[in-house]
């Protein structure tokens, strides 16, 4: 019988995995089995947090807009402001409004005065 030498495919797969997990701490960057488990876990977390990031930024934008709008008066709120925007067909999204609220509050006051 001739001797069959192992191929390079498994080694290539482990090398790729090691490159991915090289920044992990302890055994998670050295042992193959724990490396695979941590790689799966990291990818699951990344996938979940990409969706969560969208929610978190939307909440942040709404909070920033609301904080600046409420300085005008107690009776005026974020929901009334957004309602007035839609009523007057001003197409500004929350991200842009939040940037305006931080960088130039007077501009946001002008927008809110125009739509009221």
Curated annotation (Swiss-Prot):
GO terms for cellular component: chloroplast; ribonucleoprotein complex; ribosome. It holds the Pfam family Ribosomal_L20. GO terms for molecular function: rRNA binding; structural constituent of ribosome. One of its GO terms (biological process) is ribosomal large subunit assembly. CDD domains: Ribosomal_L20. Gene3D superfamilies: 6.10.160.10, Ribosomal protein L20. It is found in: Plastid, Chloroplast. Its main location: plastid. SUPFAM superfamilies: Ribosomal protein L20. Keywords: Chloroplast, Plastid, Ribonucleoprotein, Ribosomal protein, RNA-binding, rRNA-binding. Binds directly to 23S ribosomal RNA and is necessary for the in vitro assembly process of the 50S ribosomal subunit. It is not involved in the protein synthesizing functions of that subunit. Belongs to the bacterial ribosomal protein bL20 family. This is Large ribosomal subunit protein bL20c. It comes from Ipomoea purpurea (Common morning glory).
